[in-house]
Amino acid sequence: MHVVVLGSGVVGVASAWYLRQAGHEVTVIDREPGPALETSAANAGQISPGYAAPWAAPGVPLKAIKWMFQRHAPLAISLDGTHFQLKWMWQMLRNCDTRHYMQNKGRMVRLAEYSRDCLKALRESTGIQYEGRQGGTLQLFRTEQQYENASRDIAVLESEGVPFRLLKAAELAQVEPALADVAHKLTGGLQLPNDETGDCQLFTTRLAQMAEAAGVVFRYNTPVDRLLSEGQRIYGVKCGDEVIKADGYVMAFGSYSTAMLKGIVDIPVYPLKGYSLTIPIADESGAPVSTVLDETYKIAITRFDNRIRVGGMAEIVGFNTELLKPRQETLEMVVRDLYPRGGHIEQAKFWTGLRPMTPDGTPVVGRTEFKNLWLNTGHGTLGWTMACGSGQLLSDIISGRTPAIPFEDLSVARYAPGFTPSSSHRLHGAHP
């Protein structure tokens, strides 16, 4: 049967690919002239299942107050007085305790680990190239307290069977040789050897090309006005003077999902603004090998073939996409501090994007009360990490297959009292 996927970012394109592989007729609609031109364009480039964790964590409320007075703070808040922003922040605050943190991180790691496996299978079956590396990820600690706090995350990693190594400062250069020059600034690190890296935009573009060759129709330059509904069904997508109809619809509009679903499904997906730099490599020996995460500044530094991607920070400022010079200076400060010989920072390209974040950090994947509407949104800073797994999972749900991982706690049910995700609505016409 015919499924319309709304959105051509990495999550939308992955959804389209796996739906097509399941035998569905698929149309992708997006306002941009091509795939991965908004949030997926220049993210941090890391595929880090073990580091999948919610921003809502114990201690964050107090840290947020402290960060208000710091020049290089990882989180910034600008209150706009809207009910949406205030409600979202209150919901996030309610998740900032140990019980919720462990629960949320556990399901995020589960989906992210599955997604990495799906990406590996896709890579092996198609040969897709995206400047990918399988060199692991290294989280860097600058204080003894950060090193000691790693035990909380290690408990989740152990419960999920994720391999890891806790390293002292003197051992960091074994993983990232260039850090030998700055080891005296660090107290240690947590390495996850199974993590990966890659250019998300390049991956999405090539997967879209493969999907198109397989029969997926892409409707670019097509802004969506609204979804048309009657009773408990969606009957079309209004795009200007045109109404595009299908048997099923998948919402993968990222930060714009909430507004597009207004009056249909209430989901708390908020735009969390982030920034990145893309830097040409100057000295191979001074550049990162894979990805490092600076725990203090919440910034990732990732190696592509001939470039370094530096990404991070979070601003709760609504849909503001202004490029702020102080944020660029923070990214430059961190990469100069850790990899002073690595790149031509004066040639860096500065970018910003809006990550679709839920209050608990977990994406919203699965069916809704509407019989032919499914969601695949709210992946926050982990869209690249979770895209393939979310796409495969959603395809299985829509096609009536039994997914490979537990999925009910990923649904919109946690924000919709009384809604039960277990009774699936299968689209006929897919391969069994």
UniProtKB/Swiss-Prot annotation:
Gene3D superfamilies: D-Amino Acid Oxidase, subunit A, domain 2, FAD/NAD(P)-binding domain. One of its GO terms (cellular component) is cytoplasm. Pathway: Amino-acid degradation; D-alanine degradation; NH(3) and pyruvate from D-alanine: step 1/1. InterPro entries: DadA, FAD-dep_OxRdtase, FAD/NAD-bd_sf. Keywords: FAD, Flavoprotein, Oxidoreductase. It is an enzyme of class 1 (oxidoreductase). GO terms for molecular function: D-amino-acid dehydrogenase activity. It holds the Pfam family DAO. FAD binds at residues 3-17. It comes from the Bacteria. It catalyses: a D-alpha-amino acid + A + H2O = a 2-oxocarboxylate + AH2 + NH4(+). Its EC number is 1.4.99.-. Disulfide bonds: none annotated. GO terms for biological process: D-alanine catabolic process. Its cofactor is FAD. Belongs to the DadA oxidoreductase family. Oxidative deamination of D-amino acids. This is D-amino acid dehydrogenase. It comes from Cronobacter sakazakii (strain ATCC BAA-894). The lineage of its organism: Bacteria, Pseudomonadati, Pseudomonadota, Gammaproteobacteria, Enterobacterales. The gene is dadA.
